[in-house]
Amino acid sequence: AKYDAFIAALTEALRVIAGAFEVHAVKPATEEVPAAKIPAGELQIVDKIDAAFKIAATAANSAPANDKFTVFEGAFNKAIKERHGGAYETYKFIPSLEASRSKQAYGATVARAPEVKYAVFEAGLTKAITAMSEAQKVAKPVRSVTAAAAGAATAAGGAATVAASRPTSAGGYKV
């Protein structure tokens, strides 16, 4: 039941975010707020996350009940790696980042206030999309092993800093 609630909540969050991006992207230029324009790279990241999520959900649905989350996490990370190609080399902390985002998103489903659930989903997905978009911008088709390892170490250090500074409650509600 917990896994099903998590999948339903994350599916809905991705659907809403992708829909908002699509609607926002087709506004006439006169209505567009310059600071709020969504870069094409971020729209591509949302599509890649959505595709990876669908693959992982399909794989997890056929797994035994006790293994669903583990199968989902592994399939999601594998699909993200396959879809990011060279960008993944500079973003090697995806498994730990996505696992922490998944756990954070699941934690939000047990929060008592709906606004806390929404805030946690929004913050987690925004951070993941932004980080993936930035990694994709700096990725080169051919990278040396040393440069890729250095990028991964730097990124992992940044992820640890973000995780350490994350509050345990939002809006006075326990998350």
From Swiss-Prot:
The keyword Magnesium does not apply. Belongs to the Poa p IX/Phl p VI allergen family. This is Major pollen allergen Pha a 5.4. Pfam families: Pollen_allerg_2. The keyword Transferase does not apply. Signal peptide: none annotated. InterPro entries: Poa_pIX/Phl_pVI (IPR002914), Pollen_allergen/Os (IPR035506). It comes from the Eukaryota.
